[in-house]
Amino acid sequence: MFTSKSNSVSPSPSLEQADADALDISTKVQLYGVLWKRPFGRSSAKWSRRFFIIKESFLLYYSESERKSFETNKYFNIHPKGVIPLGGCLVEAREEPSMPYAMKISHQDFHGNVLLAAESEFEQTQWLEMLQESGKVTWKNAQLGEAMIKSLEAQGLQLAKEKQEYLDKLMEETEELCLQREQREELERLNQVLEAEKQQFEEVVQELKVEQEQIKRELELTARCLKGVEQEKKELRHLTESLQHTLEELSIEKKKTLEMLEEDKNQPQPLTNQSEQPPATDGLHSNLRQIEERMQELLAEKLLAEKRMKENEERSRALEEEREFYSSQSQALQNSLQELTAEKQQAEQELKAEVKVRMDLERRLREAEAALRSLEQGLNSKVRNKEKEERMRADVSHLKRFFEECIRNAELEAKMPVIMKNSVYIHKAATRRIKSCRFHRRRSSTSWNDMKPSQSFMTSQLEANNIEELKEVAKRLSRDQRFRESIYHIMATQPGASALPRGGK
């Protein structure tokens, strides 16, 4: 029954680019070819061949001879044998007796079904697809499509305007974020410097602890020396009182001897006793000389004891001054140690807080970047729905909150590098001051070595060594005191120092 050739169905010129250029736009068709057709409206098993053309949403059919004219002139006849509107039609494949590749076209307004048949499965599939696509073109769909196009155009213009505004704002905020990244890098570099300064602080604290222990030992030694001097002062005072008492007794004895000599001189002696008088007088004179010699010796001892007491008083006063000096230096070192410990703890807390803030900022920055990417994808997407619009609004709100928070914190974050730079400069100035103090300490070491120890006649070699140790401790304490005073002076006079944290405050 199938006598037609396999090329009875041909694609439309719109599907073939070479043929599309040769046709007028009004004559372009979607598909044409020869199909079998059963009569409409009456029950008949007879099939006849017809030339069919799909033009827009209409199916036109002619006699089979019209195909040759159409392929030659590329124009279709405007007087077809019949026209079937395809808008809203249901097209499906169907098997008929002797026609395995049949197609049924039905519509609620048709009084019957339109039955067509192709000669191969490929042709059937091709015609089914094109008929179904053409059936989608209706007046209602055209009106809806036009309204949708206008709505999408207006929405596209509004979204394009909003996109441009968002892009401008995002460019400004991106520049702000770049500036914040640079500030964060500067803060990280300064944190590294401060970490090195923290290590130096720990070394200074350790040195101060060692010096404090040494001062405690030297202070105990000074206290023992002072106690020995006080004991020596008591012994010298007792010796002086004893010598004074002895001198008074000798003075009384001398006075009595002189009185006896005066009485012997004034009293007349018998002639018989003249031979015995010289020995008695000589004895009194001898006793008087002995008393005078003894008094001179005691006076010399008394003067020596008074001299020793004076030296001991001077030594006691010097030791007392040294003890007070060591006590004040020990207290100063203790205060400095507490301040440095507090400053170290404060610096650690600030570093931890800075790391926490930086991690939070990086987290919020990642969230903002994710929201920005989502917003870009939503703006570039051609498909619009309510869910995507809600997501875009949420992304915009998130970005707005993030940038507003960045603007609020901009001033405070801008001041942080200046404060941290000032702290680094102060530490550098303190380091230079430490070197200067050490230089002056080396210069003053010669003056300490030239000093003579003030020792009394009872000072032993061990006490002399202790005095030398006390002088060395005094030198170290003097050096440390200047160091601490110089640091406090630099920190008090440096610009911006009031913004630095101080331990214990």
Swiss-Prot record:
Residue ranges annotated as coiled coil are: 146-391
What the entry lists under Gene3D superfamilies is as follows: Pleckstrin-homology domain (PH domain)/Phosphotyrosine-binding domain (PTB)
| InterPro entries, sorted | PH-like_dom_sf, PH_domain
Query: According to the lineage, what is the superkingdom?
Result: Eukaryota
Keyword Lipid metabolism appears in the UniProt entry: no
Asked if the keyword Cytoplasm belongs to this entry, the reply reads no
Q: Where is this region: Disordered?
A: 264-284
| Ranges of residues in domain PH | 28-136
Q: Entry's Pfam families? A: PH
Q: Which residues, renumbered to this chain, carry the PTM Omega-N-methylarginine?
A: 502
Q: Which UniProt keywords apply?
A: Coiled coil, Methylation
List all Polar residues biased stretches.
267-278
The record's similarity note reads: Belongs to the PLEKHD1 family.
Name of the protein described by the UniProt record:
Pleckstrin homology domain-containing family D member 1
**Chain's gene name:** Plekhd1
